[in-house]
Amino acid sequence: TGLIYVAARNAEQFTARYGGINRVVFIKYDALDELNIIATPDYIIHGAGLASPELYTSKPVETILSNFDGVHSLLSFAKANHVKRVLYISSSEVYGKKRSEKPFEEGTYGEIDIDNIRSSYAIAKRASEMLCKSYCLEYGVDVVIARPGHIYGPSSKQNDKRVSSDFAFRAAFGDKIVMKSSGIQKRSYCYSIDCAVQILTILLKGECGQAYNIGHDEITTIRKMATIIAQAGNVKLEISDPTENDIKDFNPMNNSALNNDKIKKLGYVDTFTVE
């Protein structure tokens, strides 16, 4: 049996989550710093980076560099140390906005507004994906890409302001849920355990240089998600007008539903529904 190295910035958070597992080892790591890893792993899963909408606008430089420089250093490490495979966790935001109501397939893309500072995240993910594909083509580094949609579950942090996490924590504390939009936006909400299974499926069965959606067959609106959580927590659901700061952080994609056919061909099957 091998070891699992968890590279992260915060040792206290690591201990709280993984401290009782003997095979899991902490490595101090910041995607913005120079890579300093003594061990040579067989597989690398790169999921580091800023993942909160309010940071995309307040820290766009760090948002871009933690993605691009972070994956660049790991790809270079993998090339030099003959790592078996690298999996880069990208995002469904690489797809951008489109007029069609159909779920996104991996080869279908919409528009990303390069003048909107919030696009720092989506553009960084697109650039990082291209770097992964380039390392695969030019240097033969075995790398695959995962594109998660909207993931929810018990691993969420209380300061996570994405709607599924924010709504869940409000309901858990008995507070009313406040929606800042009509909630008609379409999403592919995926439970964290299903997400983990899909990541491992891509890691073990995916094709080098290819990207795979991580989502769920069930397409859900934000309003439906809010209603389900409010009912489960027995709290009120209200709609209020968004502030300018709220609007600045909004995901511009009214439809970010994902087509899961490609990962299903690797043998993956959904387990959990939103309900």
Locate the predicted segments by residue.
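Conserved catalytic-core motifs of eukaryotic protein kinase domains, centered on the activation segment
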Residues: 17, 54-62, 97-102, 156-157
